Amino acid sequence: MLDKNNPCISNLAQCGLTLEKLEKLSVKSNLGVSFVEDLGRFSKEELFKELQTVTDHYNNEAILTTIDIPFRIKDLNSMLHNYERYYYTKEANRVFNDILGFRSVYTNYDDVLAMELPEQFRISDMSHGKTIDDGYRGVHLHYQMDEFHYPIEIQFNTEWDLQFNQWLHKYVYKKSIPNIIGALLRRYYENGKIKSETDFKEVLNGGIFNRKE
């Protein structure tokens, strides 16, 4: 059971995202391989055939129309990019953990991190950055019924972090730009030197990272 007294859980429920709906939205793989296994254990052809089926399913899922939280369904090109990037280093459930992803804007991360959750949930705390910092900030909640079901992701961001994350996604991610650039841009954002999308682009394109701090 979810702790309904937690304001974060209460907010999700008010928007229609309940544990019962997460269970109904969960899709079980028919490949017969646990998602805790490395990607190399999967047939690439069969995996992507199933991923296409899963995305088609979500694109026609009526339950999603009853949930008042922004969501997105990942496209196959993005999944292929992640597959090729992490083929030798990641478990499948760490790569395909956000085919269906919800995004909740919240005032702070304390309530999110304080949630008491059933074993089907896993929290990834990136409120102070990733292990290898690329500028992103947030807390991700992954729901997975068992190791043969595709995970569902719920992203929690403050409005301030969400704004910067969106600029990162638009101008930095998937463009072969080193992680350190995102981390440096974040520093400028926190120091007040980046206050708008225009500022972000000017700092990114202005060669400022060739200078000594």
Stretches found by the model and what they are:
Residues 28-87:
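Surface-exposed, low-hydrophobicity interaction/linker segments
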Residues 91-203, 210:
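Long beta-strand-rich cores associated with HINT superfamily self-processing modules
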Residues 7-10, 64, 84-91, 124-128, ...:
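Sparse, context-dependent recognition of short Cys/His-centered cofactor- or disulfide-binding micro-motifs
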Residues 1-52, 153-213:
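An acidic, glycine-/histidine-flanked metal-binding catalytic module
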Residues 20-23, 54-64, 105-114, 198-199:
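Short low-complexity stretches enriched in small and charged residues
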